[in-house]
Amino acid sequence: MCRTLALLASCAAVLAVAPVSAQRPTTDPLEPGLDTVITPTRLVQALSDVPASVTVISAETIERFGIRSIPEALRIVPGMSVIHATGPDYQISYHGTNTLSPRRMNVLIDGISVYRPAFSEVIWSQLPVAIEDVQRIEVTRGPNSASYGPNSMLAIVNIITRNPNDMTLGLGAGTLGSNGLRELTARTALRLGETAVGVTASTSRDRGFDSLTQDTAGHDSLRIDRLAIRSQSRTGTQSTLALQASVARGTAEIPFIDNFQQSYPDRRFEDFYAGAQWATQLAANHELSVRLDHARQSSRQSWRTCLPTVALLPEMFALWRANPRYANEVLAGRVPTGGTPTDNALALAAITAIQALGAGALAPRCVRANQDVIQRRLDLELQDTYVFSDRLRVVGGLGLREQSGESQTYLGGKQSSTVRWLFANVEYRPVEPLSLNVGGYFERNSLSPSTFSPRAGANIRLAPGHTLRLVLSNGTRSPDIQEQRTNWSYRFEDVTPPLNGSTTAFFYQSRTGPGNLKSERIRSREVGYLWNAQSMGLLVDARVFDDRLSDLISERTNLAGLVPTNAGSVRLTGAELQVNLRFGSEWNGYANYAYLDNREATNILERTQWSRHSGSIGLSRDFGGGWQAAVAYAGQSGNGYQQSAYGRTDLVLSRAFDVDRVRWRATFGLQRLDSPLATYSIGSAEPLESRRSNRLAGYVRLAVTVP
């Protein structure tokens, strides 16, 4: 089975790609001007019918406000916590909580998850999509495990790219800016019979921060190159085939890993994604689709470090494995007691080895360490959508995933798991003012016990343009391979001078996974209100919520830290307001605010990323003659443990003009930080700091579009 899936995925990669969403958002016919979305339930629904609060960031908004990256776009989302820790490192989570592991939010690109299976992470700076290819971003604010399963526990971000059928013949764009910013993007699209193909290549360079706690020289630049191919084909009168493949590769500078390092532990990465979706219209009211996705994410990280010889002794490695307390006692120069006879024998062997070294026990030996990781996932999913009547629609499906992580350091080799799932969502309108949504997602995971995530929502149209929303939902996050099955140890090579005649050695500390972790859980309650005043160009979405998170894996994961447990919990309550404005053809704007209360946390780490107050506001105007200007502000109060406040003002001025049917657009952007210093927590006694030398930053961008 796995070999067959792998072969199919490889074929899909060769063929090229396209968005894999069979249902494209349109406009709600009942309320003209009101967007429809697909992410919350997998059904195309009007915002007034979805059982969730949704933020939609359009390509127009991205262009108007000079947004240059997806992490920066998410600052618009009410309640979204965005911390730019270092140049390549963004810590992003809806409602924050644990900054050490912001792994409770799923991220999709055209419905394909980029969530990494072995470490439950999303590396935002390595997303394989150029901002120029983004058609819209749909953010479901609240648990969405009922539609997409575990890991969509707090929210889900769905990045929807441009359909090749809608792309122009060519696009070229270049950006120059402060902090060494250099960006180039080129895109072309063409039609080959019944197939439309789009190809985008981009490259980006950024110097990062000017100074870091762990490196005053600010060694945190990012260099990344991307290539994406998408295709959309008609394979019959009622069927389509969408294919996609993308790669992102580059180098992320890392300033620090250990106190004895002699070289920078920079990380070289290469991420590959491929997907195929075949969809067929079996009848006017019945659609079937099959999706196959493959991802391979490789990270190579090695550095030179010089450690005291005693830390490399095999006797110390064996003693730590048996009894870490004994090992610490021996290193402190004491004879440990209270252990088993085996512990005592291992302690005696370690003490004898240390005594044999004499003063050389503290002499440095230089080694080459690595944290290389390869993560893979292969998904096959069948989805069936059936419209019984104007009052009843159903979507359901099943899927299979094979996923693995391979790392000699973190996993002692290769660890794999298998995931199977079933899901369904039902939309029912018993009477015209009322829309009901009920859904659930059942998952069986070889890593942890099975889970079921249900959701029920009721949308009541009180009057034209006024909708009351009530939502009850439960969500989960499955423990990842590293949390559950870690076999963490450092095997050093090129030991200089050799130790006992060997050029390899193990660091004395190690860790194994508990193997008995269960899924994290959330129980969410929401009351929302949507006001669509089309005549005023106004759309307002307000909600209050009460989220109770339990069975959290809160502990800091490192060699000498606590063993991971499900002992954590926290309660998140608050309110959010989202306003979109459009006054005629000249004015556009938005205003968002979130109030969040993080309480009853059992572990301080669950309070390392949260802001009681956060929000954003933006306004743009078209002046005619191609001139356009925008101003925006985003900020958060930074109430988390060791977390600083954040605020930034953006000014954008652009001019679009045509020359011989070719559209040119020149953009100038200026940014001002409230503070050049950002602090964040890694669970240690002191916060880490990242600093800019100047509050002001600017950029210029020139884009040309060939129709």
Model-identified regions with their sequence ranges:
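N-terminal Sec signal peptide and the immediately downstream disordered periplasmic leader
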Residues: M1-I67, P71-V77, A189, R234, ...
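Gram-negative outer-membrane beta-barrel transporters
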Residues: D390, V394-V395, R429-P433, G537-S550, ...
